[in-house]
């Protein structure tokens, strides 16, 4: 059973008037990108899968990702694209052009259309159930958190209690510290600190290494606020669920406004090795 092929339509609800403009499958005109995307209005797209239809709202707060997504729809890029990775209680991912080919035997998830996009990460846009977010390469090779040009995922996630969320905050802050220290050490102007770190590591001087890392943290964290979940996030993760451990790491640029049950159906589908749906 092929659950994966995506078809997109564009729909636009003009605020208050409930006026619906429905465009043909995978057809998005320049008029929509220019005149119809107004302050206070948001574009919605219909995603059709063999499991049913979802309506996705695209955030104006993330215009780079919104416009790129609409451009791909306009160019019919998503014709025949499949969800190549689905994980129960986590998410469903799509956007690899190789997923169009049912005979493709290579690893999916390594290819995208176009250039990477600069991150548009905001605390108010988070990974609640139904969030639409951009996939990306990991921090080690992508410290700027730039997004894939075409790959996205939709969150299923699960519910968390307050204690679990508190522990998650601590882990996210540890990751943030590590990323900032890594960026600092890669900067050629900080070669002296990198040399000190290497000497400590080579000689097993852990106490001295901790002192150096402490000095670096004091510099890179002095103007950085610690990550904390807002009350809105806490309430959402406790009641509807999501993937809070991804917050502050990936660009969330939209959400499911209708058809959330379709994501549940996709994410609980039987899979092959590599989390590829059958």
Where are these regions (language model features)?
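Bacterial Sec-dependent N-terminal signal peptides
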Residues: 1-41
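Cyclophilin-like peptidyl-prolyl cis-trans isomerases
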Residues: 13-15, 31-278
């Amino acid at each position: 059973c092929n659950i994966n092929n995506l078809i997109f339509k564009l729909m636009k609800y003009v605020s208050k008037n409930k006026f619906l403009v429905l465009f043909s499958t995978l057809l998005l005109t320049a008029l929509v990108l220019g005149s119809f995307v107004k302050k206070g209005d948001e574009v919605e797209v219909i995603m059709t899968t063999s499991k049913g239809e979802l309506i996705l709202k695209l955030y104006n707060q993330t215009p780079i990702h919104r416009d790129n997504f609409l451009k791909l729809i306009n160019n019919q890029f998503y014709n025949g694209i499949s969800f190549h990775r689905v994980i129960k209680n986590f998410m469903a991912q799509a956007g690899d052009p190789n997923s169009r080919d049912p005979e493709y035997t290579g690893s999916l998830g390594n290819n995208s259309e176009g250039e990477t996009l600069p991150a548009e990460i905001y605390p108010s846009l988070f990974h609640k159930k139904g969030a639409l977010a951009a996939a990306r390469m990991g921090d080690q090779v992508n410290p700027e958190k730039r997004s894939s040009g075409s790959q996205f995922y939709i969150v299923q996630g699960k519910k968390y209690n307050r204690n679990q969320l508190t522990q998650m905050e601590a882990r996210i802050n540890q990751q943030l510290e590590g990323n900032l220290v890594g960026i600092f050490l890669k900067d050629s102007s900080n070669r002296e600190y990198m040399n000190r770190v290497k000497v400590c590591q080579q000689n097993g001087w852990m106490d001295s290494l901790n002192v150096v890392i402490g000095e670096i943290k004091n510099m890179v964290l002095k103007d950085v606020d610690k990550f904390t979940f807002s009350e809105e996030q806490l309430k959402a993760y406790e009641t509807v669920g999501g993937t809070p451990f991804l917050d502050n790491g990936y660009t969330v640029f939209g959400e499911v406004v209708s058809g959330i049950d379709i994501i549940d159906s996709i994410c609980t589908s039987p899979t092959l090795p590599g989390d590829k749906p059958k």
